[in-house]
Swiss-Prot record:
Transmembrane regions listed in the UniProt entry: none
Protein's name according to its UniProt entry: Small ribosomal subunit protein uS10
Keyword terms of this UniProt record: Ribonucleoprotein, Ribosomal protein
GO biological process terms held by the UniProt record: translation
């Protein structure tokens, strides 16, 4: 059985996300890995509306927005050296990296 790794990368800042994705792809190409992506996933927008005053002026409100950008990279034919290389990479504080390993029947 083969193993595929799905790498989900999330960030609030788009420039940090692109830098992280570029770093991932460069490291993976250097190790001659078969990969698909980076695939741009839909951006998630969250909006929050709060009252400015705690007691009066219901019409006076503030709006806040939080945008989360996401990318997906799929690695085919996982090797132990690639897994060590992936876990050893470090990224900026605003980037979240999620690794999932799936078994693929051949």
């Amino acid at each position: 059985m083969k193993q595929d790794i799905y790498i989900n990368i999330k960030a609030f800042d788009c420039s940090l996300l692109e830098e992280c994705v570029r770093k991932f792809v460069d490291e993976l190409k250097r190790s001659s890995a078969k990969l698909s992506g980076p695939i741009a996933l839909p951006r998630k927008d969250s909006k929050f509306i709060v009252n400015r005053s705690p007691h009066v002026d219901k019409k006076s409100r503030e709006q806040f927005e939080m945008r989360t950008s996401r990318r997906l990279i799929v690695l085919h034919d996982l090797t132990p050296t690639m897994m060590q290389m992936l876990t050893g990479l470090s990224f900026s504080a605003g980037v979240e990296v999620d690794l999932k390993v799936k078994e693929v029947k051949v």
